[in-house]
Amino acid sequence: MELTNLIEKCTKLSKDFATEVEKLWNDELSSESGLSRKTRNVIRNILRDITKSLTTDKKSKCFCILERSTINGEQIKDVYKTIFNNGVDVESRINTTGKYVLFTVMTYAAAELRLIKSDEIFALLSRFFNMICDIHRKYGCGNMFVGIPAALIVLLEIDHINKLFSVFSTRYDAKAYLYTEYFLFLNINHYLLSGSDLFINVAYCAVSFSSPIRVPDYIMEALTFKACDHIMKSGDLKYTYAFTKKVKDLFNTKSDSIYQYVRLHEMSYDGVSEDTDDDDEVFAILNLSIDSSVDRYRNRVLLLTPEVASLRKEYSEAEPDYKYLMDEEVSAYDKHLPKPITNTGIEEPHATGGDKEDQPIKVVYPPNNDKDDAIKPHNPLEDPNYVPTITRTDIGIADYQLVINKLIEWLDKCEEECGNGGEFKTELEEAKRKLTELNAELSDKLSKIMSLERDSVHKTERIDRLTKEIKELRDIQNGTDDGSDSSEIDKKIIRELRESLDREREMRSKLEKELDTIRDGKVEGSCQRELELRRMWLKQRDDDLRAEIDKRRNVEWELSRLRRDIKECDKYKEDLDKAKATISNYVSRISTLESEIAKYQQDRDTLSVVRRELEEERRRVKDLESRLDECTRNQEDTQEVDALRSRIRELENKLTDCIESGGGNLTEISRLQSRISDLERQLNECRGNVTEISRLESRISDLERQLNDCRRNNETNAETERDATS
């Protein structure tokens, strides 16, 4: 169904989105959770519609329509506020697929509408993706993925993209595989695009995206691009294809499907498919012109996501799968051409009992102004400019080589059961001979087809070149004088070219007849050729994939080694920080001890002064003794003399004790100073060796104890000195 009006389209898509979320509302998140193609298309359609509304005067109306849509009777705006809860305990609230889809889509839509600065978008997405990692870590839902729309991606710098990539690459327990692949693709694409002239550009409205490599469908879905968007490619890309639609499931299973694709011959397309909201829409770019060594998505199983998302393979575990030959090639959709009328009352050939596959297909065009030609089937043979297009179908439908091999196997089995002398021996030998001849004929036809196709391509290119030259010569002829010599020469050249063109057309007609005879009449040659091409292609892709696997294995081994080295470095750094802290503590303690030693040196100086005073007191005592002797000789009263003598003896004893005590303290201080100097020297040596710290600690403790003893002795000496002076 084609949609045109923006508001009507937004209303319908918002309703579809709400309905899809309701269906998934109670599906609990788990390792098997994933979004179907229908759900992914619904998400892409609503985000595209909001992006388109940003360039109109209805900038916020589409978003308001989405907010007012109801889920289980409640508006989406209120439901979103409830499950978000200001970012508190989000991983516990978002526990189902429906809540996950609503949370991601509403966050992206609000960001598109309200944010325009790259830093603001980056800040929002950083917080948002950390919440996503918490959800994936809690429920292990590695296949859940709703990527950033292109409307936000184009506003981010490559540094922002790399930082967002690191959010997922560093959260090893998050199991957000598709998000990691998404940002890895954006990173690879940026650096390859900056150094390459080859590119494919997809754009709609004001949003565009360019890539020199293949773009998987889930990347296109995340960026919100569709096959109906404007596509432009550089002229050097010759083998480029756009997948547009899923046709059917392969082998009636959901593990793989057959898709339609369009080969991009022109440099620009205004869309290659119709703009619809169908559930089976697909959009992926296959670029076979790029070197496979720089492209992770050459493998078909990585380019096209299966219907069941949990069956998707990772890059490291994907087996070679190149079923591109099984997909159906279709022509590009042109919205300027009228649609074929299928209900015209003309009897179809197969309706009369004929074989449907053997009947020619008649394309009926709309009636024009001529009443006689109101309904006229188109006959390609009457069109001189008609070039037949040979399309491929499923290889398994008419692989006659496999049929021949099966028949030979069956005949061998019959011969064993019937015996060598059976009545059917002659018939069996004749059948084997015919099959052998048929096999040889198939090989001959195969080589002939390859030769004819090469000649056909060469002749077609030559015809196009000659046609272009004839057109140029006709333009020259129309602009010259008929009586001039150059005009005669031009006419002669034109006649020769026309004759050559007639010969080429005749040769081309023969080649087409031969191709029609072999490929349409005897399909086995075409199928055999396609089978061989597929085998060759598979072998080449298998070799490429094995080389990529080896490279990845080497890179992973190197990454593992680097991680181990980083862990060891972190451990050494932690030990070094601890050692530095310990050394800093000991340095501070040593500084304290040095200050105390300086204080005790001052006390030693004071003690020297005391010693000098004691010596002076000794001299005074001697002087007193001499005076006492003189007094004794001069006085007869001895009682006072005895008292003075006892006082002198007492003072002498105290003086002797003080001198002895002072000398001991000086000796102890000198010894401690020498030990402290030796300790300082050893400490300087120990600063380069962390193992000496413990020994220094014990020695410093002993030194502190001795200093405390010395302090007590000095206090005792001070008391003695006070007693002596008194």
From Swiss-Prot:
The keyword Lyase does not apply. This is A-type inclusion protein A25 homolog. It is found in: Virion. Structural protein that forms a matrix surrounding the mature virion (MV) through interaction with protein A26. Presence of protein A25 in the virion structurally prevents direct virus-cell fusion mechanism. It comes from the Viruses. InterPro entries: Pox_A_type_inc. Residues 612-713 are annotated as: 4 X approximate tandem repeats. Sequence repeats lie at residues 612-634, 639-661, 667-689, 691-713. Gene3D superfamilies: 1.10.287.1490. Belongs to the poxviridae A25 protein family. Residues 342-361 are annotated as: Disordered. Pfam families: Pox_A_type_inc (PF04508). Some orthopoxviruses such as cowpox, ectromelia, and raccoonpox viruses, form large cytoplasmic inclusions within which mature virions are embedded by a process called occlusion. In those viruses, A26 bridges mature virion with inclusion bodies through interactions with proteins A25 and A27 on the mature virion membrane. In camelpox virus, the protein A25 is deleted in its C-terminal region and no inclusion body is observed. The lineage of its organism: Viruses, Varidnaviria, Bamfordvirae, Nucleocytoviricota, Pokkesviricetes. Keywords: Late protein, Repeat, Virion. Residues 347-360 have a biased composition (Basic and acidic residues). GO terms for biological process: viral process. GO terms for cellular component: virion component. It comes from Camelpox virus (strain CP-1). Interacts (via N-terminus) with protein A26. GO terms for molecular function: chromatin binding.
